[in-house]
Amino acid sequence: CIPVANQPSIAHLVTHLADLGFTDIVITIGYLGDDIQKALGDGSLYGANITYVSEEVKLGTAGSVKNAQKYLEDAPFLVVGGDHMTDLNVLEFYRDHMASPAVTSIGLISIEDPREFGIAEIDANLRIRRFREKPAPGEIFSNLASTGIYVCDPMIFDYIPENTKFDFAKDLF
């Protein structure tokens, strides 16, 4: 847990999400899982109710979400990496997703040099037409980079294999 202002960075994230109304939080844990559980407890200190799902082997970003499916299959859900520090209004992003027919919405941001990120090309209706994870210099077709923040409809689970290492950016998009 990386400390920021005398708190683990994930505590800032949980507080931010709870302040926006995302109070039921599922955290998939593997590496440093015990430290994360000790730091956050049940989440009540941060205005949240936290459920932990252990990952015995590395399953990747989408695989770990699939591993937590039983806690996420009732409604669309937000996916945010535990190492994210953001002040983005993810509630607005969530609401935009709810108003669309999309199975998944990917948070995008315009940046100067997108080589270290997944990039997307969108059409006039904001639908993603192409996505490439960490493009080589000759493969860059957009400066819209993935934030690694997604809103997923539970239908997404139909596209993620069980007990398999599977990443949103590399394997699903």
Where are the predicted features?
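A structural signal for short hydrophobic beta-strand segments in well-ordered beta-sheet cores
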Residues: 1, 119-122, 173
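Conserved N-terminal catalytic core of the sugar/cofactor nucleotidyltransferase
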Residues: 3, 7-81, 90-92, 108, ...
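Residue-level signal for inorganic ion chemistry
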Residues: 10, 36, 68, 83, ...
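Acidic/His-rich active-site region of diverse nucleotide-sugar glycosyltransferases
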Residues: 60-62, 117-133
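Catalytic-core segments of class I nucleotidyltransferases/pyrophosphorylases
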Residues: 76-78, 85, 91-98, 112-114, ...
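A short, conserved acidic/glycine-rich loop-to-beta-strand motif
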Residues: 100-110
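Conserved hydrophobic/aromatic beta-strand scaffold that supports enzyme active sites
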Residues: 106, 119, 149-151
